[in-house]
Design a protein with these regions (language model features):
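Short, Lys/Arg-rich, polar N-terminal cytosolic tail immediately upstream
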Residues: 1-11
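Alpha-helical transmembrane segments of multipass membrane proteins
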Residues: 26-34, 57-61, 91-100, 169, ...
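Juxtamembrane helix-loop-helix connectors linking adjacent transmembrane helices
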Residues: 40-50, 69-134, 220-221, 226-229
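Structural signal for the C-terminal ends of transmembrane alpha-helices
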Residues: 63-73, 195-197
């Protein structure tokens, strides 16, 4: 009787993980759309490729999450503790700025520079999408779906799960090219994974991600504009 109960629980959990895997593959498929576009490089140069991809990912992923996944274990809002949030955000800032300073590498990625150089409304559209939209579906996919998948496959090993998820998170950011950026992304992802584990949900990692992108974008924009003033 106990074996039958265990098998039923295992089957149900396996079904849930299969749904999460489908969500992750949807994200990957949309992310790699530029590889199949003949004018992908031209769209990127004009600053149009990023908003197209982000918009597509959001309009497909968020509704599916809201309808099918938001009530599943670890995929809801979770709890929120300001002290934990503040500590983790300080850690993210240290990773973003102290680590490059210590390593002696302070150059801005070419993609980030190209975003700052975009004129008029294109820059602001990209900035709004980067700050408020991308973090929502990225956390749904990585700290939500992919975390659940890996946690199941790795026998409930939280640390191993966080490492694998963070490796995947850094790798899919195809707009970057330098190894130190991928290291920073990996460490930031570990911090966001800690937020997910501590809060047992996605609200805290989403808000951390939004605030991080806002600070980084604001500082880069200020650094770009100051020499011109």
């Amino acid at each position: 009787m106990e074996d039958k109960k265990y098998s039923c629980e295992y089957i149900e959990r396996n079904k849930a993980v299969s749904g999460c895997f489908a969500m992750f593959m949807l994200f990957v498929g949309i992310t790699f759309i530029p590889s199949f576009l003949k004018d992908g490089a031209e769209l990127m140069a004009k600053g149009l490729l990023f908003p197209i991809i982000v918009t597509l990912e959001f309009i497909f992923i968020f509704p599916l999450y809201y309808i099918f996944f938001r009530k599943r274990e670890g995929l809801g809002l979770g709890s929120f503790r300001f002290k934990t949030f503040f500590i983790l955000f300080l850690l993210i800032l240290l990773i973003q700025y102290l680590l490059p300073y210590i390593s002696g590498v302070n150059e801005t990625e070419s993609w980030s520079e190209s975003q700052m150089a975009l004129g008029g409304y294109i820059f602001w559209i990209n900035a709004i999408l980067l700050i408020f939209i991308a973090p929502v579906y990225e956390e749904i996919i990585f700290r939500g779906c992919l975390f659940n998948i890996t946690y199941f496959w790795f026998g409930n090993n939280v640390f191993g799960t966080a490492v694998i998820v963070s490796m995947m998170f850094s790798v899919v950011h195809l707009q970057y090219t330098e190894i130190r950026t991928f290291i920073v992304l990996f460490l930031v992802s570990l911090t966001l994974s800690a937020a997910r584990v501590k809060s047992r949900g996605l609200l805290m990692p989403v808000l951390l991600h939004i605030l991080m992108n806002a600070v980084v974008t604001g500082i880069q924009y200020a650094a770009y504009m100051l020499p011109a003033s």
